[in-house]
């Protein structure tokens, strides 16, 4: 399943202080007209931040202290990563996404370095 479409928008921002911030959305989000639209917007995004530590086997762990979904608050989110030039590939390690309770899955997200 392509949760956020073929060309999602987003940023993964590591800071010098050891914090990681991630936001990812569907590209064609529209302003909501009603409560149903608001719910669709919530389901079409992901955002979290926390202290991050890199492990020695190409994995990192984020201790989440703020998130778009309360289920991720105060959790550890572990990701595998691979760097190839300006491309960072990040994959989940078998997780349950809060928008899909009871279903375990894996995601791979590719981030390209920007000059901004």
Summary of predicted features, one role per range:
Residues 1-47, 54-116:
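Lipid interaction determinants
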């Amino acid at each position: 399943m392509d949760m956020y479409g073929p060309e999602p928008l987003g940023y993964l921002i590591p800071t010098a202080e050891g914090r990681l911030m991630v936001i990812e959305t569907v590209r064609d989000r529209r302003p909501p007209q009603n409560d149903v639209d608001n719910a669709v917007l919530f389901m079409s995004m992901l955002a979290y931040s926390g202290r991050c530590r890199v492990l020695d086997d190409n994995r990192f762990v984020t201790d989440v202290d703020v998130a778009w979904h309360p289920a991720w608050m105060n959790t550890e989110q572990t990701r595998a990563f691979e760097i190839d030039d300006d491309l960072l590939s990040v994959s989940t390690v078998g997780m349950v996404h809060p928008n899909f309770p009871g279903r375990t899955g894996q995601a791979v997200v590719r981030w390209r370095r920007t000059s901004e």
